[in-house]
């Protein structure tokens, strides 16, 4: 198979370390790197095929997890951060020089407000939670991927043990529905 889903997936998954304490993420600039410190491991780490997430060059998917907002702090070169799309629900903070997305934060009322979206692959520390599933898989078609190649994409995910969804995982979709029902007074 010639396609690259993501470097952390293409050759099989590396299991994370239980109780992993977190670490630092760095942009790709050769010097004066943005540094973001994460005070815990990520949760719900997954491959994402949406058109908004940052992806390594040549990859069809990003790998992104969430972490409580209070566990995220910018610890160097915050002046280089810029918001990619100020109208998006997830405010993706990227390096204004190299373009790497450092973290995404939700400021509006949303089921995931209080969680930041991060790419643990930007860390030089090993042990982060491995991807757990693949989300928004069909969305790569909207970005120009040929529909007839989707069986190969799904088979490649399945070969490394990842279930594929065209939304989020059932647990995350349940969390969204629960939040919505509570806000509507149904729960």
Curated annotation (Swiss-Prot):
Pathway: One-carbon metabolism; formaldehyde degradation; formate from formaldehyde (glutathione route): step 1/3
Residues annotated for Zn(2+) 2 binding in this entry: 48, 50, 53
GO biological process, one term: formaldehyde catabolic process
Catalysis: reaction(s): S-(hydroxymethyl)glutathione = glutathione + formaldehyde
GO MF: S-(hydroxymethyl)glutathione synthase activity; zinc ion binding
HAMAP family according to UniProt: Formald_GSH
Family: Belongs to the Gfa family.
Protein name: Putative glutathione-dependent formaldehyde-activating enzyme
Pfam families reported for this sequence: GFA (PF04828)
Sequence positions that bind Zn(2+) 1: 27, 29, 95, 98
Keyword list, A-Z: Lyase, Metal-binding, Zinc
Function: Catalyzes the condensation of formaldehyde and glutathione to S-hydroxymethylglutathione.
Database matches in InterPro entries: CENP-V/GFA, Formald_GSH, Mss4-like_sf
Positions of the CENP-V/GFA domain: 20-166
Protein EC: 4.4.1.22
Cofactor: Zn(2+)
Note on how the cofactor is bound: Binds 2 Zn(2+) ions per subunit.
